[in-house]
Amino acid sequence: MVAVLTWALALLSAFATVQTQKGFWDYFSQSSGDKSKVARVQQQKLIWEPTSLKDSLEQDLSNMDKFLEKLGPLSGQGREPPGLPHDPEGMRQQLQEELAEVRARLEPYMAEAHQQVGWNLEGLRRQLKPYTVELMEQVARRVQELQEQLRVVGEGTKAQLLGGVDEARGLLQELQTRVVQHTGRVGELFHPYAQRLVTGIGRHVQELHRSVAPHAAASSARLSRCVQTLSRKLTLKAEALHARIQQNLDRLREELSAFARAGAGGAEEGANPDPQMLPQEVRQRLQAFRHDTFLQIADFTRAIDQETEEVQLQLAPPPPGHSAFAPELLQADSSEARSKLQARLEDLWEDINDSLHDRGLSHLEEP
């Protein structure tokens, strides 16, 4: 419950930052004189048992009073719950003071939760790093193997290449055959590594779920959704990476095959192929394949960092004073910022609802 409260206070700070606090209190003031509107809002938002619903604003204020009273032990000092003023402006000022006081006491909890969740997400990144490192090592190794396997023009074959049309055409046709054969084999060798990456993502993200649960400010339901979303995103990105590597191989095969066909066609027309051009072309194409694939693997690694950082902000945002706290909400008069703030408030409502529901069930189970 402390984690949920901390998140609530953080978002109230964001309210002030994006200049929406006044509209919130205007709405609250109007609602104070309209009990039927309060009842409608409660019917739309509250999903716990009907017996726990309070239909009057006076009871809501009483609950707020008890809520503030329960915060007293956090400072180690018991105190009487403050009386709430009847005028909305006085209520606004008093609640602001209470929130500022409570936020100051709870910020250490929020900072610790943010740090703990971040540490667990960093653990996930460390666990996935060997998969990408292994993939890059395999790319480098397979490129070297391809270069050896496609080395059809050596000291012993230069004379064959220059010996006549038939010899040159036969050598270039052999190159075409080798290109198709060995690039296909490399594609098959990459598949198990890509599959291990996908499997590793699923396993390590589930381990993350268990390790981060005690520290997250989110409800268990929202935590599960965040973890499932992270697993799905990373899995899709890993599958897309495998598809791009295969596309790189297909392009390499097509380019080398086209070069060999062009050389064979020139040989038939009587042109003698340059013995140095063929190995140079093979080497350049292989280096381009290696370079492009390395960049794509690096992009995938950065995507892991980005997705895990986003999850950290969702599950355990930093304290309001932290530079990473809700940076997208600092754009005043921005419809996008208001939309994101609304989404976070809806998440907050779900967390509070689940926490109160769980507390209610625990009280019912007490003898």
Swiss-Prot record:
Highest rank taxon of the organism: Eukaryota
Q: How is it modified after translation?
A: Phosphorylated by FAM20C in the extracellular medium.
Chain positions with Phosphoserine modification: 56
**Gene Ontology BP term (one):** cholesterol metabolic process
Localization per Swiss-Prot or TrEMBL: Secreted; Early endosome; Late endosome; Golgi apparatus, trans-Golgi network
Look up the signal peptide feature and give its range. Answer: 1-20
Question: What Pfam families does this protein map onto?
Answer: Apolipoprotein (PF01442)
Q: Which UniProt keywords apply?
A: Chylomicron, Coiled coil, Endosome, Golgi apparatus, HDL, Lipid transport, Phosphoprotein, Secreted, Signal, Transport, VLDL
What GO molecular function annotation could you give as one example from this UniProt entry? cholesterol transfer activity
Chain residue ranges for the region called Disordered = 71-90
Listed GO CC annotations: chylomicron; early endosome; extracellular vesicle; Golgi apparatus; high-density lipoprotein particle; late endosome; very-low-density lipoprotein particle
The cross-references to InterPro entries, in alphabetical order and at most eight, read: ApoA_E, Apolipoprotein_A1/A4/E
Protein task: Minor apolipoprotein mainly associated with HDL and to a lesser extent with VLDL. May also be associated with chylomicrons. Important determinant of plasma triglyceride (TG) levels by both being a potent stimulator of apo-CII lipoprotein lipase (LPL) TG hydrolysis and an inhibitor of the hepatic VLDL-TG production rate (without affecting the VLDL-apoB production rate). Activates poorly lecithin:cholesterol acyltransferase (LCAT) and does not enhance efflux of cholesterol from macrophages. Binds heparin.
Which family does the similarity line name? Belongs to the apolipoprotein A1/A4/E family.
Note the subunit structure: Interacts with GPIHBP1. Interacts with SORL1; this interaction leads to APOA5 internalization and sorting either to lysosomes and degradation, or to the trans-Golgi network.
* PANTHER family, per database record: APOLIPOPROTEIN, APOLIPOPROTEIN A-V
Q: What is this protein called?
A: Apolipoprotein A-V
Taxonomy of the source species: Eukaryota, Metazoa, Chordata, Craniata, Vertebrata
